[in-house]
Regions:
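Beta-strand elements of well-folded, non-transmembrane domains
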Residues: 110-114, 127-133, 146-150, 160, ...
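Beta-strand-rich N-terminal accessory domains
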Residues: 1-59, 156-158, 215-217, 273
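Short, well-ordered beta-strand segments enriched in hydrophobic/aromatic residues
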Residues: 12-18, 140-148
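Extracellular/lumen-exposed scaffold segments
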Residues: 29-81, 188-205, 211
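Extended, loop-rich substrate-binding clefts of extracytoplasmic carbohydrate-active enzymes
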Residues: 61-136
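Beta-strand-rich recognition/accessory modules
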Residues: 216-274
Length: 274
């Protein structure tokens, strides 16, 4: 089995035996980098890009919901068809290092600010993708360091609904996975500290989740490595959206000059425990 990591016109990807294993888009219409596709070594795609119900969902991406009341998550137009929220996310610098073993390091600098105005938050993001194992398994580690350029408050739509009745929403922000609907149906989910369903994990799980395909044993492990005390996992009832929101339980304030560190890891495995 051979694998190579290569630059593309808009980002970087790893190809294994002629098939894309993972692809990172940096230069995007939304100005928000995202991974798509993320594939199992078998070739099955995990992620869903710009689904019709939420065209601003970008497979595996990071987006704040609100900063100082300004919306960064979804389009600003009432029809929710545009790509431009009220707040701008801007990639201002990128550096990509490709290893001969098909590993990859990406360093990004981003800014966040109201559209057409000065930025209020700066970010340094480091993305490390491991060289795939002989089996094709790989891991992605994403490290975010946010620096407040003014006093800021990161916020979300407050959680609402009743998980006991199978209907809930709100609380989301930050790094998010939008899962392919067919694979989401098949996945079982298990919390690393609590819960074994979307209802029992949402608002409670803090460490991570393991998604498993029972028929094949393939697993996706989504770990939260560093986050504030306000962070909790949020999962749609049908598992199509997964988000370790740093502001699930409440807003997070950051004074000018202060920093916030967030870190996550995705492990794509051919069988549980590998």
């Amino acid at each position: 089995m051979s694998a190579r990591c290569e630059r593309t016109a808009t980002g970087v990807r790893t190809v294994r035996d002629g098939r894309i294993l993972w692809n990172l888009e940096i230069d995007t219409p939304e100005c928000r980098p995202f991974f798509h596709p993320l594939n199992f070594p078998s070739g099955r795609t995990i992620t869903d890009l710009r689904p019709a119900d939420h065209i601003w969902h970008l497979a595996a991406w990071f987006s704040w919901k609100r900063i100082n009341g300004v919306l960064y998550w979804e389009p600003a137009d009432k029809e929710l068809r545009g790509v431009a929220p009220e707040g701008e996310t801007r990639v201002v610098r990128q550096e990509i290092d490709v290893g001969g073993d098909a590993a990859c390091d990406v360093r990004l600098e981003l800014e966040y600010g109201p559209r057409g105005e000065k930025p209020v938050v700066a970010e340094k993001r480091t993305i490390r993708v491991s060289a795939p194992k002989a089996t094709g398994e790989y891991s992605i580690t994403i490290d975010h360091v946010f620096t407040a350029l003014a006093d800021v408050t990161f916020d979300r739509t407050p959680p609402h609904g009743d998980v006991s009745k199978g209907r809930w929403g709100g609380g989301y922000a930050g790094f998010t996975l939008r899962l392919d609907p067919e694979i989401a149906k098949e996945f079982t989910v298990h919390g690393l500290s609590v819960g074994d369903s979307p209802a029992t994990c949402t608002g409670k799980e803090t460490r991570g989740l393991v998604f498993t395909l029972p028929k094949t044993g393939e697993t996706l492990r989504f770990s939260q490595l560093d986050a504030p005390e306000t962070a909790r996992f949020y999962i749609w009832p049908d598992k199509r959206m997964v988000n370790p929101s740093p502001v699930f339980t409440g807003p997070y304030g950051l004074e000018k000059g202060k920093t916030l560190h967030l870190a996550y890891r995705l492990d794509v495995n051919v069988c549980q425990g590998t």
